[in-house]
Structure formats: C-alpha cells, structure tokens
From Swiss-Prot:
Residues 29-50 have a biased composition (Basic and acidic residues). Residues 51-60 have a biased composition (Basic residues). HAMAP family: UBact (MF_02133). May function as a protein modifier covalently attached to lysine residues of substrate proteins. This may serve to target the modified proteins for degradation by proteasomes. Keywords: Isopeptide bond, Ubl conjugation pathway. It comes from the Bacteria. InterPro entries: UBact. The gene is ubact. The keyword Repeat does not apply. Belongs to the ubiquitin-like protein UBact family. GO terms for molecular function: protein tag activity. The lineage of its organism: Bacteria, Candidatus Fraseribacteriota. This is Prokaryotic ubiquitin-like protein UBact. There is a cross-link at residue 60 (Isoglutamyl lysine isopeptide (Glu-Lys) (interchain with K-? in acceptor proteins)).
Length: 60
C-alpha cells in the first residue's frame, strides 16, 4: 500500500469563501423569525389536533 502524502499546513484560520466582502454572489436575505404564537394560532384555525401535537413536540 502506498504511503500517504502530507500537505503543508498554514497558520491562517479557515474562512468562508465570501468572507472577503465580495458582493458579487447571492446572499441569504436578512429576515426575522416568525412568531411561534402566530404560527400556533394559524394552526389552531386549520387543524386543532395538529396544533396540539406541534405544541407538545416543540415544548410550548
């Protein structure tokens, strides 16, 4: 079995490819998380039993 080759390591930390301030690529939109109370109220209107199961799973 051939020996493994080792590559030289660098002292620089790993960074994301877009960390350099590059504005050319797509980026995820900055949106706030939906309020879980509103979600539960909407679920209650559609299917009360499903809302109860979701509430038990999510710990609310």
């Amino acid at each position: 079995m051939p020996e493994r080759k080792t590559q030289p390591t660098t002292d620089q930390p790993w960074t994301k490819p877009n960390d350099g301030g590059d504005e050319s690529g797509p980026r995820s939109p900055e949106v706030e998380r939906p309020n879980t109370r509103d979600l539960l109220e909407r679920m209650k209107r559609v299917d009360p039993r499903q809302a109860r199961r979701y509430r038990q799973r999510s710990g609310e």
